[in-house]
UniProtKB/Swiss-Prot annotation:
This is Thiopurine S-methyltransferase. The keyword Methyltransferase applies. Its main location: cytoplasm. The lineage of its organism: Bacteria, Pseudomonadati, Pseudomonadota, Betaproteobacteria, Burkholderiales. PROSITE patterns: SAM_MT_TPMT. Belongs to the class I-like SAM-binding methyltransferase superfamily. TPMT family. S-adenosyl-L-methionine binds at residues 10, 45, 66, 123. Its EC number is 2.1.1.67. Signal peptide: none annotated. It is found in: Cytoplasm. NCBIfam families: PRK13255.1, TMPT_Se_Te. HAMAP family: Thiopur_methtran. Keywords: Cytoplasm, Methyltransferase, S-adenosyl-L-methionine, Transferase. GO terms for molecular function: thiopurine S-methyltransferase activity.
Length: 219
């Protein structure tokens, strides 16, 4: 996935990946992480996800990163927020209370920014990236998070030869290989969701599972 592909999808309204509700799996599994109140939570490729509003409501400082300025502006407009805006080397920052979105490239985040994150939530980032970029993403983003940073990762597992991504299939073997050496990725839930995703069925996908991981950055 290149930047233009992602930006075009937002401009053209091809954003079926956007959910109009908070992700139930986030609500179910996040509390057990015990991320401290006031801790900063990274949400990469954030779009305009309502999950960020929910995380902020848990007393956390949310740091979303999103390439599309349109998505960032829609997030604040649709949630009735008027952000303060400033620029840095990392991108254009939109800040309202404990919600901050950086309109920019997640790979441009500085070491200090990532090291300061106490939590991370990834529902739509890893699965949006093609294989070579997934390796870079895991290494350069997760590999720079601070020791003890905890989070939730949600992926999809389906026969990749039956459908072109994104979203891409990222099975357990790949997750373990991507995070080996710097992050513990423990599979805590797996469920068949094919009957809830008709677009996959229509494209000939015979099996579709969602996988949920508890992440913890190793020292």
């Amino acid at each position: 996935m290149d930047a233009d592909f992602w930006l075009d999808r937002w401009r053209e309204g091809r954003t079926h990946f956007h959910q109009t509700r908070v992700t139930p799996l986030l609500q179910k599994y996040w509390p057990a992480l015990d991320v401290p109140a006031g801790g900063q939570v990274l949400v990469p490729l954030a779009g305009k996800s309502l999950d960020m509003v929910w995380l902020a409501g848990q007393g956390l400082r949310v740091l979303g990163v999103e390439l599309s300025q349109l998505a960032v502006e829609q997030f604040f407009d649709e949630n009735g927020l008027r952000p303060e805006i400033h620029q840095s080397a990392q991108g254009r920052h939109y800040v309202a209370g404990n919600l901050e979105l950086i309109c920019g490239d997640v790979f441009a985040l500085e070491d200090a920014t990532l090291a300061a994150c106490a939590g991370v939530y990834d529902r739509a980032a890893l699965v949006a990236l093609p294989e070579p970029m997934r390796k870079r993403y895991a290494r350069e983003v997760y590999g720079r998070l601070g020791r003890g940073c905890r989070g939730i990762l949600i992926t999809l597992d389906y026969p990749q030869d039956q459908m072109e991504g994104p979203p891409f299939s990222v099975d357990d073997a790949e997750v373990q290989a991507l995070y080996a050496g710097h992050t513990e990725a423990r599979l805590i839930d797996r469920r068949d969701i094919l009957d809830k995703e008709p677009k996959f069925n229509q494209r000939g996908v015979a099996r579709l599972d969602t996988l949920v991981y508890r992440l913890e950055r190793l020292g």
